């Protein structure tokens, strides 16, 4: 039995090493051949083995009796401690907000506000429609719910005489809400019997520069991540206490509401809720399985039927383009055509270039190995669904024939979510919009902004510590360790807790760009996963 378990463990390590080595080689753009890739696989096998061993020992060392230190009482689960830690975190976030006043935002956010505010919206993507305007309330290129929220605060700023005030108020409110949420998570660990050092580590983590930077940044991914954490906590409650009477009522209602909210904040939220809630069928008993199905399908009904079929036509909202869904497929086909044009018939080439506003001669110049946007933004909006279906059949045929090329196209973009190559990206500035006559940051704090940015860059380059400043640690390495630990400790029911995280990793893998904000929901939930794995070690010791 032990030999079988060891064999499975080694196969698992090899599997992780192969994925990570591919992510490493292709994300770097290495072309050193099979031998170099094999060497990386062996190195990553050793690194994963060492990481699993060290992580388990580190968690075991934290199993310390609470009475040894009086300061452990700070993390006991009561409203006073939640308030204290909330104020501490808010003080950190508020300091960041003052330095980066009125806070940071993204180019996408500015476009969203321009979209709704002007009423005559430019079609930002694809490129060949860059000068086309449509008479619409807004475009669903970005989630309309977040567009409404961001524009609401922009208008508040205008009413108060300065658009910067609206951005500041939004980031102030977001910082306060995140402070309360994160403090509640830290103190909630006490009710789970988690070792108190985990609560301390989590508090320091939530006060870290990367979390503070995103707490004062207006953007759809930040807003989605906030609601995702709440969703994950309720998902955690139901998955770990499937027979609890409370979960049969209040928890299921909360899960349904939060499933809809994460879908409204980010389109991938609909698919995450669908897949994750259906996974609850594996752990919940009897009639509760109906609840799991309902909560899974509700976001699909709201977004695909109520919004797309009823509200959008009624309110004159233009649906988003299909290129967002097809971007990864376009990227794979583009790379395959560039490297192996002889494998495509003239009819297949004509089909692909009918969908994209791009000639075969231009493709190599348009293609970017690290981002899908340049290729997908050439999509012709008027393309018929039957043409897209024909293309997908062609894509599937070539995927089977050229899996290596297609996989390389994916990892060239998003290998940084698997291999420890990419540090955190944060937003510390605001893009100015001539259309909105906003936003801007004062010159008097420029030196402080530069100093904090340099400090974060310095942290990311400290040996050993830099491991915790990598996207891949939160998106792949620690979840992979968690799966290993749950299986080793025979706590397989906890594997279900990885479903939302695995779903998000899937979307990261086929995403348009390797950027921290897309992985933010997994970074925010890391302390929860840390607590669960610490609890797994503790429960085993008590058996």
Predicted regions and their residues:
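Transmembrane signal-anchor helices characteristic of membrane glycosylation enzymes that use polyprenol
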Residues: 12-25, 44-49, 78-106, 300-312
């Amino acid at each position: 039995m032990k030999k079988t378990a060891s064999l499975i463990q080694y196969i698992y390590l090899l599997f992780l090493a192969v994925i990570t080595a591919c992510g490493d080689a292709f994300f770097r753009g290495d072309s050193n051949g099979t031998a170099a890739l094999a060497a990386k696989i062996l190195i990553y096998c050793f690194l994963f083995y060492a990481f699993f061993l060290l992580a388990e020992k580190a968690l075991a060392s934290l199993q310390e009796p609470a009475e040894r230190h009086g300061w452990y009482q700070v993390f006991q689960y009561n409203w006073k401690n939640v308030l204290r830690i909330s104020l501490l975190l808010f003080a950190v976030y508020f300091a960041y907000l003052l330095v980066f006043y009125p806070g940071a935002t993204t180019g996408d956010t500015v476009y969203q506000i321009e979209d709704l505010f002007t009423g005559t919206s430019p079609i930002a993507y694809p490129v060949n429609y860059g000068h086309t305007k449509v008479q619409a309330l807004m475009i669903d290129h970005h989630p309309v719910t977040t567009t409404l929220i961001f524009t609401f605060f922009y208008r508040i700023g205008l009413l108060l005489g300065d658009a910067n005030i609206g951005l500041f108020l939004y980031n102030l409110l977001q910082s306060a809400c995140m402070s309360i949420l994160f403090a509640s998570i830290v103190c909630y660990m006490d009710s789970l019997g988690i070792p108190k050092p985990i609560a301390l580590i989590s508090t320091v983590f939530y006060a870290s520069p990367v979390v503070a930077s995103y707490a004062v940044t207006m953007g759809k991914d930040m807003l989605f991540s906030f609601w995702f954490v709440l969703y994950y906590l309720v998902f955690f409650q139901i998955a770990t206490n499937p027979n609890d009477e409370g979960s049969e009522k209040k928890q299921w209602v909360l899960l349904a509401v939060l499933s809809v909210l994460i879908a409204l904040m980010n389109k991938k939220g609909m698919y995450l809720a669908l897949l994750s809630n259906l996974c609850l069928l594996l752990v919940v008993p009897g009639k509760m399985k109906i609840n799991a199905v309902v909560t899974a399908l509700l976001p699909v009904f709201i977004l695909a039927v109520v919004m797309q079929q009823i509200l959008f036509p009624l309110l004159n909202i233009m649906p988003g383009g299909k290129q967002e869904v097809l971007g990864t497929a376009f990227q794979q086909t583009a790379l395959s055509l560039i490297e192996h044009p002889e494998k495509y018939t003239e009819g297949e080439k004509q089909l692909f270039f009918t969908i994209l506003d791009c000639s075969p001669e231009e493709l190599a110049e348009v293609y970017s190995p690290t981002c899908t946007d340049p290729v997908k933004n050439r999509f012709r909006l008027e393309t018929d669904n039957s043409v897209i279906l024909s293309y997908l059949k062609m894509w599937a045929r070539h995927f089977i024939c050229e899996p290596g090329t297609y996989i390389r196209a994916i990892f060239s973009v998003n290998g940084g979510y698997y291999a420890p190559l990419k540090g955190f990206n944060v937003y510390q500035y605001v893009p100015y919009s001539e259309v909105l006559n906003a936003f801007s940051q004062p010159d008097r704090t420029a030196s402080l902004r530069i100093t904090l940015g340099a400090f974060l860059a310095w942290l990311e380059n400290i040996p050993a510590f830099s491991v915790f400043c990598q996207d891949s640690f939160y998106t792949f390495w620690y979840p992979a360790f968690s799966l290993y630990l749950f299986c080793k400790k025979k706590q397989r029911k906890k594997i279900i807790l990885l479903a939302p995280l695995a779903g998000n990793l899937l979307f990261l893998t086929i995403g348009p760009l390797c950027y921290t904000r897309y992985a933010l929901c997994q970074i925010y939930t890391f302390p929860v996963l840390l607590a669960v794995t610490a609890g797994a070690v503790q429960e085993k010791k008590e058996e």
